[in-house]
């Protein structure tokens, strides 16, 4: 993808991890719009990264972005997507685990390109697999700069990836805690 604006609907841990990965990568992004919902995380991200703008609301984020990343819980997604006005032909990348493509299309109600993705916390250090469904050349290129894209052709198969990814976040959290503990005990992080 060329120089574009992207927006993150939802400002939690996965959004933070993806944004960290973006700034460590060679991705050329003009501006990143983030939703104001979690003010604390939004302000921390804006302080760290100059190209971030905290949107006044979710609609402004959608209006300003070429790509919109849906990084909200399934409950929130179901509630807010119907109220938002997406642009025709906008690219939507959904991290919402339990909303399939048909449900997302129905909630969005516009002709947009939707790709589901499963980023995990190591994306912040540009590591790990990122399953996407359905395959999409631009989304694959984007995520290949943040890890290793795994294209899933069949959405039914993607359910297995969603299930296992739910177990990976706590696993990586435990590894991080253990690594931090070793550093406190005098071992260099590079070891």
Region locations from a protein language model:
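Rossmann-like NAD(P)(H) cofactor-binding subdomain of soluble oxidoreductases
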Residues: 39, 49, 58-132, 136
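Short acidic capping loops at alpha-helix termini that bridge into adjacent secondary structure
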Residues: 29-31, 89, 190
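Short, flexible micro-motifs
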Residues: 10-15, 24, 100-101, 125, ...
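NAD(P)+-binding Rossmann beta1-loop-alpha1 motif at the extreme N-terminus of oxidoreductases
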Residues: 2-56, 60, 64, 145
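Hydrophobic residues at beta-strand termini and immediately following loops
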Residues: 55, 117, 152
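Internal alpha-helical scaffold of NAD(P)-dependent oxidoreductase catalytic cores
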Residues: 103-113, 128-162, 166-191
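Electropositive phosphate-/nucleotide-binding environments in soluble metabolic enzymes
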Residues: 8, 12, 16, 39, ...
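Alpha-helical scaffold segments in soluble metabolic enzymes
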Residues: 13, 17, 21-22, 44, ...
């Amino acid at each position: 993808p060329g120089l574009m604006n992207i927006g993150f609907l939802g400002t939690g841990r996965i959004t933070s991890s993806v944004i960290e990965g973006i700034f460590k990568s060679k991705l050329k992004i003009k501006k990143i719009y983030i939703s104001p919902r979690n003010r604390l995380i939004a302000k921390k991200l804006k302080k760290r990264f100059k190209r971030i703008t905290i949107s006044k609301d979710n609609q402004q984020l959608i209006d300003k972005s070429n790509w919109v990343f849906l990084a909200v819980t399934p409950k929130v997604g179901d509630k807010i997507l119907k109220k938002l006005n997406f642009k025709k032909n906008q690219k939507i990348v959904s991290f919402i685990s339990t909303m399939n493509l048909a449900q997302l299309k129905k909630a969005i109600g516009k002709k947009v390109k939707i790709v589901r993705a499963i980023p995990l916390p190591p994306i912040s250090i540009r590591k790990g697999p990122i399953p996407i469904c359905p395959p999409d050349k631009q989304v694959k290129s984007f995520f290949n700069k943040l890890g290793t894209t795994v294209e899933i052709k069949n959405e039914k198969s993607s359910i297995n990836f969603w299930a296992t990814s739910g177990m990976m976040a706590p696993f990586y959290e435990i590894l991080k805690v253990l690594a931090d503990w070793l550093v406190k005990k005098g071992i260099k992080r590079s070891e």
